[in-house]
Amino acid sequence: MLQPKRRKYRKEQKGRNTGKATRGNAVSFGEFGLKAMGRGRLTARQIESARRAMTRHIKRGGRIWIRIFPDKPISKKPAEVRMGNGKGNPEYYVAEIQPGKMLYEMDGVSEDLAREAFRLAAAKLPIATNFVVRQVGT
């Protein structure tokens, strides 16, 4: 699963996920893309699960790019622990997603195959997504 190799600080504040994606919102590497329409957090497990669903569907053909990386640690206190006594330990990592962010890209397969692979991947994700095709000249 994806997670940072090193971090300057082990824990991070919650913050607010506002606005829409101004960077990473175009198809840059492949021919087809899966774009986020909603806002939310994708865990490393969800990103990997969607990747596996796509990879299994396209079999040996094509190439997949993951355009997001889970770099934000989410901490959690153990079960049945009283409040206070500091912040919990990092449990997993998430990628903060704004509307318009390109999540995955694919190349080397037909549009029908890519569309179906992205449909299977989107079923694994907790946010609304759209299938997009690269515009001519970009």
From Swiss-Prot:
Cited Gene3D superfamilies: Ribosomal protein L10e/L16
Molecular function per GO: rRNA binding; structural constituent of ribosome; tRNA binding
Family annotation (InterPro entries): Ribosomal_uL16 (IPR047873), Ribosomal_uL16_bact-type (IPR000114), Ribosomal_uL16_CS (IPR020798), Ribosomal_uL16_dom (IPR016180), Ribosomal_uL16_sf (IPR036920)
A Pfam family per the record: Ribosomal_L16
Biological process terms in GO annotation: translation
Biased composition (Basic residues): 1-13
Region (Disordered): 1-24
UniProt keywords, alphabetically: Ribonucleoprotein, Ribosomal protein, RNA-binding, rRNA-binding, tRNA-binding
Any GO CC annotation of this UniProt entry: cytosolic large ribosomal subunit
Task of the protein: Binds 23S rRNA and is also seen to make contacts with the A and possibly P site tRNAs.
Assembly notes: Part of the 50S ribosomal subunit.
Family that this chain belongs to: Belongs to the universal ribosomal protein uL16 family.
Protein name: Large ribosomal subunit protein uL16
Native source organism of the sequence: Cupriavidus necator (strain ATCC 17699 / DSM 428 / KCTC 22496 / NCIMB 10442 / H16 / Stanier 337) (Ralstonia eutropha)
Gene field: rplP
